[in-house]
Amino acid sequence: FPAAEKILHEYDEIARLKKPDCRTDGLLPFVLGRLKSCCAAIEAEGHTIRFAVARGPLNIASYLLGQTEFLLGVKTNPVEIHQLLRIVTDFLIEWIGLQADTIETIDGIFLLDDLIGFLGEDDFCEFALPYLKAIYQSRRTRVRFLHNDAAGLITAKHLAELGVNLFNFSYKHPISEIRRLAGDSVTLVGNIPPRETLAEGTPDDVRRSVAEMFEGIDDRRRTVLSCGGGMPPGATTENIDALLTAAQ
């Protein structure tokens, strides 16, 4: 998959970083224009654009600085890391808002941020929670969706405080454990193995994984059956059909 090349090589370079204008800078206006021009065709196929979508603030900050450097900086250069996260968060609030203002069917915010899964609880509460919360609170939407398929137990404990009501998490966490931590107000999206089962397994493997996932779960409300992570390349139609059948 393509990856972003970092542009910050020292922590003191963060001070010169300028927040992009999402209306004019980079590929952003082209992406939004493409979505807008495709709305009619998307709706003709029975679909609708429901979410303003973005990578989360820690994910983007790590693209700019490097993942190792970002995580080390949480401990060695916290002032600069907060400065970087404020810039990225302000940008994301504007970008989410522009998407919602441009496409009237949007009624949700969808953030994808796996870097939050690499933080301990104290660091999560200091470096992740306030910035994610600010983004989710920036618009009044019915759905506030978070994807983190790295370590997710700490994230799950704080979903209510973040304002998140839809959570996609790693297949390595039993859905019962995430439910216990997240509470009953959050709808859970997951969580069969994406690559090992949905892409590389057989339809029988998919059905078996779904059955195992729901073992010991008496209340299946607020659960959307899916994979515990992103949809993998190579998932066959037969396996997807098996997942849909199992959901019924």
Place the predicted regions along the sequence by residue.
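Active-site loop segments of alpha/beta catalytic cores
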Residues: K18-Q248
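A contiguous, low-structure linker/loop signature
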Residues: F1-P20
